[in-house]
């Protein structure tokens, strides 16, 4: 895939001067080399395109796609993502005033449209918008930085072609920076980095750049050098063009170019040489010129950076201060210069007519429609479904087919989003991100025009780690309460709703305390329902550690319809490298059990695994093998075999030596060094394992693995231990076996709650 991307990029640089990337839209060629190269790579003939659309229309669409960028802005919490997006919208003319994140002026940042986001100063939902820069359309998704809302990052990256990874020049590479970068790597996203907050006390961009190399394994180099730091930060020197830029005017809207300051000449040439060396390591064309000691021209270096970035072999590093309105315009230029257009990105679908055979999509408007629903929202006019179009065209009034459900749906309204505002459009084509109203579907569904039966590969959805019991205080609010839970569960795949079989309470599960607190607050605000909330619960799991046999006969033949079903086999733990949580294998030879009863047996075992006998939590990492059984010509039924399976599982479960698994969190602490001993001592009491300890100036950064069950109320405890100077972040790491004493305590608590010994 990387070679294909690099080939496309080289074709681009061979057939079209790079300076055309910055030409006004009217001066652009009718068919870009990037689009032509991508079409050739996918084997798309001009004849097939002409059959689908008028030649001029196809050329117009291709030109539009070549001048399009679909990007996300992601980072650790409080790194300045939304502030950066606000400046991008201002400089591109999408908004006419700059407002700050926390809404101190009563307005708040454009992309934080929820009241809760403006009050708390954090992004909770990803928000989409679009803008125009130098004749290019840039579609942007601003994502949350808090780990509890990681699904918003997952689904944004699933549909994007490029990304900006924002890093704090003071905090450096933090825990969520690592998580976000891992997500970008999973979805093979080319990216540029932006080291923000150069105006802050303690800013050190070179330290952060080196951290990205060591902690994120980035093959990177700076494309800019800052003119001053902290209070003396004035502007930037472009290492490609060898020009200095300062940002003047009340909001930094005037970019003034000048020569490189004389006192920076040596540093600039040193950093430019480093940039050329790093790019030469992954780009043959530049390496050849560099090894021959040829002078490297700006357009030559720019083309090499683009080839390497699109091929995901290099990450250019930009710098600035979004809050101080410095460095944003050059970053926008970098998005156009170095991140791919939709036709340079390879996207795959699964052909349902060919046993989910992997298909490379053409990525052009001339092909049949293929679009992915990646996000749902409840709008004022019904369900709002966000779509990324990979192939074809969608028009208002079209009939489209949901491949996952088989339903035919008419598109009543088609819009482009600008945060919480909408702009009606008549059509949208491949490469675009739009939204439709009135289309009932689930997140992850694929839509086509009916001529193909493709589904897009699914995104990664993490399992919830924490639960709460909730109930409406007023019985009259039950309807609205249920409506809220149904809506939120549909919109957010990491938000789950269930019923406690013992108490009958409604249980909501999510990614952490903040995640669940936000939903409880939204129920109160948006549905006017006050809810009673129980104590947070950890989502434990159960598993087995050894093989155990089962042989169970379920027999009921005392009047009425009889029941008869016998199942024999064994249960065993799945190998540690297995991705699945449950496997069922039918190893019966012959017809001891008629084949039509096998699905009922599997269903019975699955149902039994929903509640283990230790503490009533789901059982995972288990393989069930059916080896023999017996049936009755009259009394055997699906129900009989399902019940036989459930009882067989309960019969052999204890013999398989079950254990309890608990969620373990990766916790990163940053505290003044004077409090290091106190904080690490407290972590040891919480049964944390220290795995890292680094010094950053006057602060110590401690990384540890801690059971989630021991982390409740930690924010208050940390403030108390560090006089309010400590901070921490936490993300899910894995489920791990609890100690024997903890298991005994959990089992006894569970038995006491059920009134059993």
Curated annotation (Swiss-Prot):
Pathway(s) the chain acts in: Protein biosynthesis; polypeptide chain elongation
UniProtKB keywords: Elongation factor, GTP-binding, Mitochondrion, Nucleotide-binding, Protein biosynthesis
Molecular-function GO term, any one: GTPase activity
Superkingdom per UniProt: Eukaryota
InterPro entries membership: EFG_II, EFG_III, EFG_III/V, EFG_IV, EFG_V, EFG_V-like, EFTu-like_2, G_TR_CS
Gene3D superfamilies listed in its UniProt record: 3.30.230.10, 3.30.70.240, Elongation Factor G (Translational Gtpase), domain 3, P-loop containing nucleotide triphosphate hydrolases, Translation factors
Domain named tr-type G: residues: 66-344
GO BP: mitochondrial translational elongation
Disulphide-bonded residues: none
Subcellular location(s) of the protein: Mitochondrion
Matches recorded under SMART domains: EFG_C, EFG_IV
GO CC annotations on file: mitochondrion
Annotated positions binding GTP: 75-82, 142-146, 196-199
Family annotation (NCBIfam families): EF-G (TIGR00484), PRK12740.1-5 (NF009381), small_GTP (TIGR00231)
HAMAP family in alphabetical order: EF_G_EF_2_B
Note: This protein may be expected to contain an N-terminal transit peptide but none has been predicted.
Family note: Belongs to the TRAFAC class translation factor GTPase superfamily. Classic translation factor GTPase family. EF-G/EF-2 subfamily.
Function in brief: Mitochondrial GTPase that catalyzes the GTP-dependent ribosomal translocation step during translation elongation. During this step, the ribosome changes from the pre-translocational (PRE) to the post-translocational (POST) state as the newly formed A-site-bound peptidyl-tRNA and P-site-bound deacylated tRNA move to the P and E sites, respectively. Catalyzes the coordinated movement of the two tRNA molecules, the mRNA and conformational changes in the ribosome.
Protein name: Elongation factor G, mitochondrial
């Amino acid at each position: 895939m990387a070679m294909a991307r690099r080939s496309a990029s080289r074709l681009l640089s061979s057939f079209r001067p790079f300076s055309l990337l910055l030409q006004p839209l009217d001066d652009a060629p009718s068919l870009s080399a990037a689009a032509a190269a991508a079409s050739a790579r996918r084997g798309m003939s001009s004849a097939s395109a002409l059959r689908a659309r008028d030649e001029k229309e196809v050329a117009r669409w291709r030109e539009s796609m070549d001048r399009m960028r679909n990007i996300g802005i992601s980072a650790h919490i409080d790194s300045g993502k939304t502030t950066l997006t606000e400046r991008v919208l201002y400089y591109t003319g999408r908004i006419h005033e700059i407002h700050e994140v926390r809404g101190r002026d009563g307005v708040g940042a454009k992309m934080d449209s929820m009241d809760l986001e403006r009050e708390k100063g954090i992004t909770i939902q990803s928000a989409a918008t679009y803008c125009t820069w130098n004749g290019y359309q840039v579609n942007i998704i601003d994502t949350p930085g808090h780990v509890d809302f990681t699904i918003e990052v997952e689904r944004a990256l699933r549909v994007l072609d490029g990304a900006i990874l924002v890093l704090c020049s003071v905090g450096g590479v933090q825990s969520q920076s690592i998580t976000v970068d891992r997500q970008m790597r999973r979805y093979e996203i080319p990216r540029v980095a932006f080291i923000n907050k150069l105006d802050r006390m303690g800013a050190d961009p070179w330290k952060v750049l080196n951290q990205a190399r060591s902690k994120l394994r980035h093959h990177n180099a700076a494309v800019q050098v800052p003119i001053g730091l902290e209070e003396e930060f004035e502007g930037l020197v472009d290492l490609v063009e060898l020009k200095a830029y300062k940002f003047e005017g009340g909001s930094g809207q005037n970019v003034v170019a000048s020569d490189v300051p004389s006192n920076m000449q040596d540093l600039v040439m040193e950093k430019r040489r480093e940039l050329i060396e790093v790019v030469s390591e992954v780009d043959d064309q530049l390496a050849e010129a560099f090894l021959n000691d040829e002078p490297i021209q700006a357009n030559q270096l720019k083309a090499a950076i683009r080839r390497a970035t699109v091929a995901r072999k290099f990450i250019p590093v930009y710098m600035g201060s979004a809050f101080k309105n410095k460095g944003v315009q050059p970053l926008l230029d970098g998005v156009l210069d170095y991140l791919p257009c939709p036709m340079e990105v390879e996207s795959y679908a699964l052909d349902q007519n060919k046993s989910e055979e992997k298909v490379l999509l053409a990525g052009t408007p001339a092909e049949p429609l293929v679009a992915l629903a990646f996000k749902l929202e409840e709008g004022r006019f019904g369900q709002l479904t966000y779509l990324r179009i990979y192939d074809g065209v969608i028009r208002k009034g079209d009939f489209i087919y949901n491949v996952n459900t088989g339903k035919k749906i008419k598109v009543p309204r088609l819009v482009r989003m600008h945060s919480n505002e909408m702009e009606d459009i008549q059509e949208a084509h491949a490469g675009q991100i739009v939204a439709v109203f009135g289309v009932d579907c689930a997140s992850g569904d694929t839509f086509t025009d009916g001529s193909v039966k493709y589904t897009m590969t699914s995104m990664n959805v993490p399992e919830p780690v924490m639960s709460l019991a909730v109930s409406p205080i007023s019985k009259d609010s039950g309807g609205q309460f249920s409506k809220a839970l149904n809506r939120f569960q549909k919109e957010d795949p990491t938000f789950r709703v269930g019923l406690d079989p013992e108490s009958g309470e409604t249980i909501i599960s999510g990614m952490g305390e903040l995640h669940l607190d936000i939903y409880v607050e939204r129920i109160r605000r948006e549905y006017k329902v006050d809810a009673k909330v129980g104590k947070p619960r950890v989502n434990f799991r159960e598993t087995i550690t050894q093989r155990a046999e089962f042989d169970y006969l379920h027999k009921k033949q005392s009047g009425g319809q009889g029941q008869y079903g016998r199942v024999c086999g064994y249960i065993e733990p799945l190998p540690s490298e297995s991705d699945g949580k449950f496997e069922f294998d039918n190893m019966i030879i012959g017809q001891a059990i008629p084949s039509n009863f096998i699905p009922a047996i599997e269903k019975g075992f699955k149902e039994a695994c929903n509640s283990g006998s230790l503490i009533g939590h789901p059982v995972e990492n288990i393989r069930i093998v059916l080896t023999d059984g017996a049936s009755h010509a009259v009394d055997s039924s699906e129900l009989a075999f399902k019940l036989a399976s459930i009882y067989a599982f309960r019969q052999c479960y204890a013999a398989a030596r079950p254990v309890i698994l608990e969620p373990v969190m990766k916790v990163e602490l940053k505290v003044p060094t004077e409090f290091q001993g106190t904080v690490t001592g407290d972590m040891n009491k919480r049964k944390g394992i220290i795995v890292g300890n680094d010094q950053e100036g006057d602060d110590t950064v401690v990384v540890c693995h801690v059971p989630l069950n021991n982390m409740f109320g930690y924010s208050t405890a940390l403030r108390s231990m560090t006089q309010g100077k400590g901070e921490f972040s936490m993300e899910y790491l894995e489920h791990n076996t609890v100690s024997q004493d903890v298991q005994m305590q959990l089992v006894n608590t569970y038995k006491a709650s059920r009134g059993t010994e």
